[in-house]
Amino acid sequence: MTPDVNVVISHSEYTVLVVDDVVSNVLLLKVLLTNEKFKVITVGNGKEALSQAVNARPDLILLDVMMPEMNGFEVAERLKADPETQHIPIILSLIHILLF
């Protein structure tokens, strides 16, 4: 029998770093996450992502794979090699929003 445990987690305690070079993707994710009461930081490239990961210490990084200059795999590799950021979970994404 499972004990009855009521655990309430406030999403506002968690910060998500959204990294994507496509503005519509960033806006969609920001709206979805803020509606769920997460704190959201957005950046548009890998260099900014590396800087914000160190400075803001997000709880999660949503990272686009297909970005110019430094792709998501390169960013993830650098984050995992850095002792200051290696603990942060990363979700790599291939989001393409079609607007008609």
Feature map (PLM): residue ranges:
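Conserved small/polar residues in nucleotide/adenosyl-binding loops
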Residues: 95-100
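Receiver (REC) domain active-site loop signature in two-component systems and cognate sites
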Residues: 67
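Acidic catalytic/metal-coordinating carboxylates
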Residues: 24, 44-48, 71-77
